[in-house]
Amino acid sequence: MQLILISGLAGSGKSIALNVLEDSGYSCIDNLPLTLVPDTVERLAPLGYEQLAISIDTRDGASRLLEVIHALETAGHNVRFLFLEARTDTLIRRFSETRRRHPLSRTALTIPEAIARERQLLQAIAGLGHRIDTSDLSPNQLRRYLRDVIAQAPGRMLVVIQSFGFKHGVPLDADFVFDVRCLPNPYYDPALRPFTGRDAPIINFLTAEPLVQAMADELSGLALRWIPVFRHDNRNYLTFAIGCTGGQHRSVYLAETLAARLRETGETVLLRHRELDR
């Protein structure tokens, strides 16, 4: 069985994720306690369920998640785990807009306190799967991103390469963060400013800069050196985030370059430009 487990912070988009999976042909179960997952899967497998997505409640059993995933994999199921999160200010705004109560606010906590408490409870499992920071994603952007994620072949490690602008904050879901603000900046050339790192004028400018090419070589070398190590550690996802000031030129160019080089070696790569996708 192809099995996708979904967890994360309240308000981070778990319901949207489940809807995307349902539209993609998965049978879906919402808000199932973690302790019931193994028995539920074993009961459904003989009935012909080939693709199952479960949004799990892990606040009371986070410490057992790795054990549950291992047991499911031992039973022959292909398991992927998605963890959705967002910045606190984003979550507060979403709860304000929807006028929903945070699940932990019933314990007399304010919304910021409830978010902080839930983040603490789930901290141990955030790194066990594919972390997805939804802070800067609209519902439609999140749907597109998730469709790209689930389209990847199960059983292979997915390398996510993301460009971003430091002025908009560092992505929460990055395993590696590279600061390339030290490189020559085409922004200061008025003729180049309107373009992005995917456009020929910027590509030509940055390709001609020795420091930029040295950075591209170093990033590629580091990625190629360490991806096999993470794969050997049974990681399903690995995220590289490359940041410049605004996320328009240098980081986009280097993310495109790194993605192309990794694809040439046979890696499964998902490329995302956070600021261009806004």
Curated annotation (Swiss-Prot):
Which source organism?
A: Laribacter hongkongensis (strain HLHK9)
Q: Where does ATP bind?
A: 8-15
Cite the PANTHER family for this sequence. Answer: RNASE ADAPTER PROTEIN RAPZ
Which Pfam families does the record associate with it?
A: PapZ_C, RapZ-like_N
Q: Which InterPro entries match?
A: P-loop_NTPase, RapZ-like, RapZ-like_N, RapZ_C
HAMAP family, per this entry? RapZ_like
> Where does the chain bind GTP?
57-60
Give the protein's function: Displays ATPase and GTPase activities.
Q: What is this protein called?
A: Nucleotide-binding protein LHK_02029
Keywords, in A-Z order: ATP-binding, GTP-binding, Nucleotide-binding
Question: SUPFAM superfamilies under this entry?
Answer: P-loop containing nucleoside triphosphate hydrolases
Q: Which GO terms describe its molecular function?
A: ATP binding; GTP binding
Per the record, the similarity remark reads: Belongs to the RapZ-like family.
